[in-house]
Amino acid sequence: MINQIDIKTRERMEACIQTFHNNITNIKTGRASPTLLHNIYIEYFGSKTPLRQVSNIIVEDSHTLKINVFDDSITSLIRKSILNSNLDLNPVLQGKDIIIPIPRLTEERRKQLIKVIRGDAESSRIQIRNIRRDANDKVKRLLKDKIISEDNEHTSQSKIQIMTNEYIKKIDCILEKKEKELMKF
């Protein structure tokens, strides 16, 4: 029973870390990266299709992305989707390809982005703590229902706390890495 709680807790914390990582990966750092466009979808044959399924996204240089579109008829749709994505990118049509210059970040914009990612990190830490609280509540219920002993409860809560500390450290590491990446350019 306690093992199930530990497994579920670890899965939920891992999902939280993954969500945080995915969210801050999409924050542009002034450097060209195909992941910048991973959340771009276009309307293709009546369904929303990820951009990476209908094109190749290539890094031309550190400040330029090039999109090789498989179907020329959707080039303008892709351009429109990028413009509407709130990524502050200005795609330029060049034949059947789309060129996306990545603007350099200003110092002010870097500071804004750092505030945003720190806020995301704090939200993720709160989620981790809430997961810990839920797991501890389940353990306490098991004790109350006399399914486990007090020793087992303390051991389980210690494991959950160690797990919590581990995942909060992971959040801090991801945050620190992204902050360094933002300040580098």
Swiss-Prot record:
Localization per record: Cytoplasm
Keyword Calcium: no
Matches recorded under CDD domains: RRF (cd00520)
Cellular-component GO terms for this entry: cytosol
GO biological process, one term: cytoplasmic translational termination
Keyword annotations from UniProtKB, A to Z: Cytoplasm, Protein biosynthesis
Top-level lineage group: Bacteria
UniProt keyword Cytoplasm present: yes
A Gene Ontology molecular function term of the record: ribosomal large subunit binding
InterPro entries: Ribosome_recyc_fac, Ribosome_recyc_fac_dom, RRF_sf
Summary of the function given for this chain in its UniProt record: Responsible for the release of ribosomes from messenger RNA at the termination of protein biosynthesis. May increase the efficiency of translation by recycling ribosomes from one round of translation to another.
Entry-linked PANTHER family: MITOCHONDRIAL RIBOSOME RECYCLING FACTOR PSEUDO 1, RIBOSOME RECYCLING FACTOR
Family from the record: Belongs to the RRF family.
The protein, known as: Ribosome-recycling factor
Species for this entry: Buchnera aphidicola subsp. Acyrthosiphon pisum (strain APS) (Acyrthosiphon pisum symbiotic bacterium)
